[in-house]
Regions:
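Active-site neighborhoods and metal-handling regions in enzymes and metal-associated proteins
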Residues: 1-188
Length: 188
C-alpha cells in the first residue's frame, strides 16, 4: 500500500534526501585510485553522523556497512572491504540510505576511479540518461509502466538491458516502500 505523506513529512523526506545527495557528492570527490572501499564507508558514516543523520543500511538485515560499494561488474549491494582497493579505470557504484529525523533518503551514483575507458563512460552516461528518461515520465496521469518503459527504451540502443530482479521503490519512514518501480514496463 502506498503511503501518502503530508507536505510537512515530504519536507522531512526531502531533507533526508539532501543529506544523502550531499554525502554522495562528497564521496564522488573522495574516490581515487589506491583507496579501499572501506575507507569510503568510513568517510560516509562520519559525514552522515556529523550532520545528525544515521546510516540506515548499517545493520539493516545484517548488512555491515554504511554504503553499498559495487566495483566494476558487481551488480548491487557490494560490501565495503579493507581488501577491495580501487584501481585507476575502475567504476564504482555507491548506494546509500540516510535516516534523518525518522525519514529516509536513498540514492546511488556510479563514478569512474580516475580516468576510465570509453565503454565504462558510455555505461555511466547511458544509465544516467535512463534515470532522467524515467524521471521525465514520473508525472500525474502516467503509470509506473510508463517510467519503466522509458528507462528500458533508453538503454536498449546502447546494447544494454535491465535487471528484472531489482527495482526502484518508494521512500519515506521505511527504506523500501511502495510502489515498486521496475526498470521495464508497458506504457499506459
Amino acid at each position: 500500500m502506498i503511503t501518502v505523506y503530508t507536505p510537512e513529512e515530504v519536507e522531512k523526506i526531502s531533507a533526508a534526501g539532501r543529506l544523502t545527495a550531499d554525502t554522495l557528492s562528497m564521496l564522488e570527490k573522495a574516490v581515487k585510485p589506491g583507496m579501499s572501499t572501506y575507507e569510503l564507508d568510513e568517510l560516509a558514516e562520519k559525514f552522515i553522523r556529523d550532520r545528525g543523520g544515521i546510516p540506515a543500511c548499517k545493520g539493516y538485515e545484517g548488512f555491515p556497512a554504511t554504503i553499498c560499494a559495487s566495483v566494476n561488474d558487481t551488480v548491487v549491494h557490494g560490501i565495503p572491504s579493507r581488501r577491495k582497493i580501487l584501481k585507476k579505470g575502475d567504476i564504482i557504484s555507491i548506494d546509500l540510505v540516510v535516516q534523518l529525523n525518522g525519514y529516509m533518503g536513498d540514492s546511488c551514483i556510479t563514478v569512474p576511479v580516475g580516468h576510465t575507458n570509453k565503454k565504462n563512460l558510455q555505461l555511466i552516461s547511458a544509465t544516467e540518461g535512463a534515470l532522467f528518461a524515467g524521471i521525465k515520465q514520473a508525472v500525474i496521469g502516467n503509470t509506473v509502466g510508463d517510467i519503466g518503459h522509458a528507462v528500458e527504451s533508453y538503454v536498449k540502443p546502447y546494447g544494454y538491458g535491465v535487471l528484472r530482479e531489482y527495482v526502484g521503490h518508494g521512500i519515506g519512514i521505511g527504506m523500501h516502500e511502495d510502489p515498486e518501480v521496475p526498470n521495464y514496463g508497458t506504457p499506459g
